[in-house]
From Swiss-Prot:
GO cellular component, one term: plasma membrane
GO biological process: lipid A biosynthetic process; lipopolysaccharide biosynthetic process; protein O-linked glycosylation; response to iron(III) ion
TM annotation in the entry: 7-27, 81-101, 111-133, 137-154, 165-185, 204-224, 255-275, 288-308, 315-335, 346-366, 382-402, 406-426
Protein name listed in UniProt: Undecaprenyl phosphate-alpha-4-amino-4-deoxy-L-arabinose arabinosyl transferase
Organism of derivation: Escherichia coli (strain SE11)
Any Pfam family: PMT
Length: 550
């Protein structure tokens, strides 16, 4: 009976966090709008080999993540939930692997359930796992690889070992098809410390080639297909998207070595109090095969991405699966022997909630700021934000009432965040980061436009997805579409600032021309170097400028 209650509670938890509130949040640009539009175009064109964005070749990532996103929009429609369905599915599958792997390591159903709940409620997992990017997919394949390698090395027969390594190769191959060759580097680096400490080199060398073969066979069909269609894909993807992005001095998203320290700290909420003890206990028990394996899968990817010059918080998502298992194991030990860490965790959550309440007041219309984050007419959003932090502090307090039994309720600290964050985003943020909001405000003007030009790729993708058209033209800036715009068949998809007046004269009689520009909040739009317009509609950070036929 208790198991049934636990399962019902888990499903209710998943529904409240990962299903019910998702449609209430508008898509963010540039990431979510980009991936939403790529998948929409894939469904519309039927081209499942070459990814396109705004009708242009888009070679920044391989294809597998777009397949899953496209299936999500195919099943649930071109809406906010449909766009995010793929990442939610991948996150829940990863949680299922956490359950299975914890159960296999410790044979403890309660521990397995706690590890799953901890994983799904970690701030970084929830933030990225409900956000339409490709990282939850690669995290799933990496965690699947972690499970497959363990399965192979624990098998007692050659058939079991062979099956495990073949499965490992498939997960690595799908990882390569999702985000590239990092899906090969991370598993290798993660298993080497365990192989070395357990002296399992023989099995690795005997059966490892099976993983190589199955990985190659997984990637080969699509790899050959895109090489035939687009011969320069692999050259661009390897040199630009891997070498330049991560290793060279001009790498994207450059950050210092310690960049991931605050990411780990913030990402571990609402379980931050367990982080030091989980890592220390894992190191202290490193003679235990399972513990050192989980510790290696937590630390090695973190070190690898810390050394790389290009860094983003999403890169280390896979580390938190093994970390959640270590946290759950440590939490049960602490509850039994010394609940000090659990008490500290409760106080951390109270402090976080109270700090958030105070910070919300400071940036509210009633606070001391001259330019508050929310305006007076957005009072309900302020109360939503207060509710988010109040619930966080409340459940932090509740875990302290009988800490040996109530500590798992820390998983409910982010409940307010999950349910209310979509209702608390300030208009000033929505106007710049949510193109859907802009489209809703300017729908009547945008719909009849013959041409739409914009100076932001993220906004362009949002306009394309909302309006169901891929012919948005880039104006002044090419951004990440620079490579695709260099192809001969992309001529006419970019208009520079100097060329715009002539281009306008040539195309004005074909229909309404709409220019959507991103501007600074205090920028005077009358000073823009553009021909006089027939209509201007400013929505704070985005401006709609229209030219009608004469």
């Amino acid at each position: 009976m208790k198991s049934v209650r636990y399962l019902i509670g888990l499903f209710a938890f998943i529904a409240c966090y990962y299903l019910l509130p998702i449609s209430t949040r508008l898509l963010w640009q540039p990431d979510e709008t980009r991936y939403a539009e790529i998948s929409r175009e894939m469904l519309a064109s039927g081209d499942w080999i070459v990814p396109h964005l705004l009708g242009l070749r888009y070679f920044e990532k391989p294809i597998a993540g777009y397949w899953i996103n496209s299936i999500g929009q195919w099943l649930f429609g071109a809406n906010n939930f449909g766009v995010r369905a793929g990442v939610i599915f991948a996150t829940l599958l990863t949680a299922a692997l956490v359950t299975w792997f914890t159960l296999r390591l410790w044979r403890d159903k309660r521990l397995a359930l706690l590890a799953t709940v901890i994983y799904l409620s970690l701030f970084i997992v929830y933030a990225i796992g409900t956000y339409a990017v490709l990282d939850p997919f690669i995290a799933f394949w990496l965690v699947a690889g972690m499970c497959s390698f363990w399965l192979a090395m624990q098998a007692q027969t050659w058939k079991g070992k062979s099956a495990g390594f073949l499965l490992l190769g498939i997960t690595c191959g799908m990882g390569v098809m999702t985000k590239g060759f990092l899906a090969l580097a991370v598993p290798v680096l993660s298993v080497l410390p365990w192989v070395a400490t357990q002296k399992r080199w023989k099995d690795l060398f005997i059966y490892g080639w099976l993983a190589v073969i199955s990985c190659v066979l997984t990637v080969l069909p699509w790899g050959l297909a895109i090489a035939q269609r687009e011969p320069d894909f692999w050259h661009y993807f390897f040199w630009v998207e891997h070498i330049q992005r991560f290793a060279l001095d001009d790498a994207q998203h450059r950050a210092p070595f310690w960049y991931y320290v605050p990411v780990i700290i913030a990402g571990s909420l609402p379980w931050l109090g367990l982080l030091p003890g989980a890592l220390y206990t894992g190191w202290k028990n490193r003679k235990h095969s399972a513990t050192v394996y989980l510790l290696s899968w937590t630390i090695m990817p973190l070190l690898f991405f810390s050394v790389a010059k290009g860094k983003l918080p999403t890169y280390i998502l896979s580390c938190f699966a093994s970390l959640a298992m270590l946290m759950a194991h440590y939490a049960l030990l602490a509850a039994k022997n010394n609940p000090l860490a659990l008490r500290i965790n409760g106080w951390i959550n109270i402090a976080f909630g109270v700090t958030g309440i105070i910070a919300t007041f400071v940036v509210s219309p009633w606070g001391p700021m001259n330019t508050p984050v929310w305006q007076t007419f957005e009072s309900y959003k302020v109360f939503c934000a207060w509710s988010i932090f109040s619930l966080w502090a409340f459940f932090g307090w509740y875990t302290l009432t009988n800490v040996e039994k109530t500590w798992p309720f820390a998983a409910l600290c982010p409940l307010g965040l999950a349910l209310l964050v979509g209702f608390s985003i300030p208009d000033r943020v929505m106007e710049g980061k949510h193109p859907q909001f802009f489209v809703e405000m300017t729908q009547e003007s945008l719909q009849p436009s013959r041409y739409i030009l914009t100076d932001s790729v993220g906004v362009a993708a949002g306009l394309a997805w909302s309006l169901q058209r891929d012919d948005i033209i880039m104006y002044r800036q090419t951004g990440e579409l620079k490579y695709g715009l260099n192809y001969p068949d992309a001529k006419g998809r970019f208009v520079s600032g100097d060329e715009f007046a002539n281009w306008l004269n040539q195309h004005r009689q074909e229909g309404i021309i709409t220019l959507v520009l991103s501007v600074d909040r205090d920028e005077d739009i009358n000073s823009l170097a553009i021909p006089p317009a027939d209509a201007i509609d400013r929505q704070e950070r985005l401006v709609l400028i229209q030219y009608r036929p004469k």
